[in-house]
């Protein structure tokens, strides 16, 4: 079972896997642990990652990058319209109103959704992980920014489903970093002590995120998060690009923005310059050859100029930091440490601003690039039964407050209730009770639209169906369970209607009593169990009680308040119903919970038909990529064979082919090379396979003759040594050598016979081989000689290595007063005289042992 964590960023991705030795960040086929989030489309296949980034300038219109923020957004979204101006590829609306990416693929114009593009990137990451782990990858944990809304998270899950990944959890970036930080800490305070507060700051390529986390031993709780979704390393690059565009326009009369390739080159050079300025404060040059119109351009900048240029961006850093402290009611003095991650935090001015705000040195103990991926892998290991991980509970926070709105039964007024406040513990479930006579709708939305970086505050509309009044005409109690799950997605998971069924008194047996008791708890204890179960995971049980108290005391919605007040009193009401009938002698009431279907109409969710179509399309593209790779491998094999033999035919292989064949083969190699770059440039795989077989028919015998000429003498030498060895042993046997006088003569004759036969065979083949020229096929191959050596050893070695039989010395009879043989016997006799009973060795004893002193020899 695979355990993989995927950090899917706007600019690059990282893959971390859990192994027996711990968490490891793995490298791709270019031995780079960083895989660019870039997909390039060609006439035959797709290229993803490093290879795609290398084509970004030459194939700008068909290379897609910086698409992460397009998830779950409509084409008319203001953010999409703004970003569209800076992209090298085209964005168009899809039929469902989403963002479509138009590219040329396989010689045709294609429209891909953002989910499909992300699925392509995940395909590459999955392939890289499988190549490293040597087994299929299915389960994983994927990171998302903490400010991603419900629609954006659902879109990422759809992308994972397209590629066949089972995403166990969508994990917030900052939560993953906190887990990676806390699980290895051995000095955390115990559960009954005050938690340690650590602030994590992450500035990546496109966003700035901060979070405050409370740590106890084996426990992590996210207290709050804050962010600026539009502040990242990309914005600093844009400042440099704007500066040099203006400079080049004045200095060289060149408008870099008029040509996308020139602009992309300038972006790449400005990014390099930004990184260099992080470690150098002196003036640094920027030089680009043949920038536009065959003109070379140059410029320079130092760190102080860069900081002055980005002063507006640097001022924005403090805004999320203030917001975080305000949300969590923390003071700067409460923060024990400040950890920074993310590539853009390497900018010295960014570090200085953060350190100045908190009034303490910032810590860089975590890997700035890989911390998120490692945290995701740890979370995946915790969720996986295949790994045993130290117990560590993770409680996340809801980034935006979520409310429900509904229409009152038989009334036009609407009821509103905030079910999850900002920074509420997650995952978490709550149960609401409604009094209804028929089906009703609930609409979920974000309570604070201004604080959500998404134009649509609505989450979805949920219709609770099959609701009916009680048989006596009273309203039915409908219990609705709302939940923010492990992915941070809001959902109405279940709905049930409490139905009262009257029963006859004579039918109320003891079994019915038990049934009544068993049916009643789902009304209240089941609710408590669900909430408590989630609370126990989240570790915030008192918060639910507080929320219930606040809800019961708040006057905005009388209907909901009265209903929620009924939940704690349900047991009392039921007790009255159970206790009263015997007094009044009325029919017994049995309470039954009826599950109700829920129809969900979400702001963003791919339909099953569309999702299946995307899965099928991705499968076809994966197969096409595989076929194209095999075709290219076959073509490269032909090209490699041509170059290899052309060099060796004029070198080591020259003696092993006759002159006429030599000239013909060289001519064929040249013709093949010309064919590869002309009509063979774009052929089917089988054409290259056939061409390689044609070359190998001539080249393989030459290569074999060369290899045989290298190996054959070594094998003959080894065979000669073995023959000489066994022949000498046979001669020593004939000369009555004591070493071999124990060997039977008939067996030694077998050795002599085998030696003579093999020696005769060797002489014959050596004489025959000597008559052959090097350009002719050998009489005998090295493998045949090796087989003869093995046969000779199998025949002779068991005979000549027979051990001599052991000669036993005669046993001497002992008399009671006989002399001692050696000191060891004397020691044993002394021990026996002191009353020690000697042990018998191997069950042997001397014939007169019973009549003599007890004595034994070791």
UniProtKB/Swiss-Prot annotation:
Disulfide bonds: none
Start and end residues of each stretch annotated as Disordered: 500-584, 796-858
Basic and acidic residues biased stretches: 563-584, 805-814, 821-832
GO molecular function: adenyl-nucleotide exchange factor activity; alpha-tubulin binding; ATP binding; ATP-dependent protein folding chaperone
N6-acetyllysine found at: 471
Modification after translation (UniProt): Phosphorylation on Ser-509 may be important for regulation of the HSPA8/HSC70 chaperone activity.
PROSITE patterns: HSP70_3
GO cellular component terms attached to this protein's record: cytoplasm; cytosol; endocytic vesicle lumen; extracellular exosome; extracellular region; microtubule; nucleoplasm; nucleus
Residue ranges with Acidic residues bias: 504-514
Residue positions, PTM N-acetylserine: 2
Sections of the chain in a coiled coil: none
Tissue: Highly expressed in testis. Present at lower levels in most brain regions, except cerebellum. Overexpressed in cancer cells.
The organism's place on the tree of life at top rank: Eukaryota
GO annotation terms (biological process): chaperone cofactor-dependent protein refolding; positive regulation of MHC class I biosynthetic process; positive regulation of NK T cell activation; protein folding; response to unfolded protein
Subunit description: Interacts with HSPA8/HSC70. Interacts with HSPA1A (via NBD) and HSPA1B (via NBD).
Membership in a protein family: Belongs to the heat shock protein 70 family.
The protein's role, per its UniProt record: Acts as a nucleotide-exchange factor (NEF) for chaperone proteins HSPA1A and HSPA1B, promoting the release of ADP from HSPA1A/B thereby triggering client/substrate protein release. Prevents the aggregation of denatured proteins in cells under severe stress, on which the ATP levels decrease markedly. Inhibits HSPA8/HSC70 ATPase and chaperone activities.
Name of the molecule in the record: Heat shock protein 105 kDa
UniProt source species: Homo sapiens (Human)
